[in-house]
């Protein structure tokens, strides 16, 4: 589960960059 956290953060950062 902990390995998913950095992936989720990078995904959120990518989405926020489009906003």
Curated annotation (Swiss-Prot):
It comes from the Eukaryota. Keywords: Amidation, Amphibian defense peptide, Antimicrobial, Secreted. The keyword Secreted applies. One of its GO terms (biological process) is defense response. It is found in: Secreted. Its main location: secreted. Belongs to the frog skin active peptide (FSAP) family. Phylloseptin subfamily. Has antimicrobial activity. The keyword Cytoplasm does not apply. This is Phylloseptin-J7.
């Amino acid at each position: 589960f902990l390995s998913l956290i950095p992936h989720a953060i990078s995904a959120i950062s990518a989405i926020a960059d489009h906003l």
